[in-house]
C-alpha cells in the first residue's frame, strides 16, 4: 500500500503562514501522515555586526524565542491531539538553519520529543544518537555557505535515511529543470543535487 504525507509543513507558530490547526486539518483531509514543522534555531546566523541586517536577525530570533516561551509545548500538544494510530499519523519535528551545513529538519518518532538545542547541525546529529529521530537536509540546491546543503557533511545511516528534493522552495535536483527556487537565497546550483552527492561517494 502507498501512503501519502508531508514531512515538512509550516504554519505561523514561528514564521510561516496560516494557523497551526488549519495546517493539521488540511493535512488530515488529504494525507496519511504529516509533520507541521516550526522553525527552531539558526546557530550560525550571520550579520550581528551589520545594522542593515538587524531586522532579519530580529525576525528569526523573535520566532525562536516565541517557540521556547510556550509555543513548542502548544505545538507538541496539538501534534499529539491529531495523531490517530492506524488513521492519521503526526510527527513532532522542527527546522534548524545553517550557513555551513544547510537547513535541516528533525522528524521524531517520540510524540513528546524535546526541543534539542545545538551549536551546529553536526552537534545536533551527535545529540540525536540513540534517539528515534531523522535529521534530513532541506532545500539542498541553494548556494553552499548560504544555507545550501554541504555534501561534505553528509552522514549516511539511520539519522539521515533520505533527503528532500522538492519543497515549496522548488526542485533541488537540477539547476535548469522545472520548478526553479522561489526564495531570495539565490538560484539553484548543481552542487546541491543528489546526483552530485552520489558522485562524491
Question: What is each PLM-predicted segment?
Answer:
Residues 1-201:
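Extended, charged catalytic domains and RNA/DNA-binding interfaces, predominantly
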Amino acid at each position: 500500500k502507498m501512503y501519502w504525507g508531508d514531512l515538512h509543513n509550516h504554519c505561523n507558530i514561528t514564521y510561516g503562514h496560516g494557523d497551526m490547526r488549519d495546517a493539521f486539518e488540511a493535512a488530515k483531509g488529504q494525507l496519511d501522515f504529516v509533520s507541521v514543522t516550526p522553525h527552531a534555531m539558526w546557530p550560525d546566523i550571520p550579520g550581528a555586526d551589520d545594522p542593515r541586517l538587524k531586522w532579519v536577525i530580529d525576525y528569526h530570533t523573535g520566532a525562536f524565542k516565541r517557540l521556547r516561551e510556550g509555543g513548542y509545548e502548544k505545538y507538541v500538544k496539538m501534534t499529539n491531539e491529531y495523531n490517530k494510530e492506524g488513521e492519521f499519523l503526526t510527527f513532532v519535528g522542527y527546522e534548524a538553519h545553517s550557513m555551513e551545513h544547510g537547513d535541516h529538519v528533525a522528524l521524531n518518532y517520540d510524540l513528546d520529543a524535546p526541543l534539542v538545542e545545538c551549536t551546529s547541525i553536526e552537534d545536533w546529529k551527535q545529540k540525536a544518537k540513540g534517539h528515534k529521530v531523522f535529521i534530513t537536509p532541506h532545500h539542498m540546491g541553494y548556494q553552499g555557505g548560504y544555507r545550501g546543503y554541504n555534501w561534505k557533511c553528509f552522514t549516511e545511516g539511520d539519522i539521515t535515511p533520505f533527503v528532500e528534493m522538492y519543497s515549496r522552495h522548488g526542485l533541488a535536483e537540477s539547476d535548469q529543470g522545472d520548478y526553479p527556487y522561489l526564495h531570495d537565497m539565490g538560484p539553484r546550483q548543481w552542487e546541491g543535487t543528489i546526483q552530485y552527492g552520489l558522485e562524491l561517494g
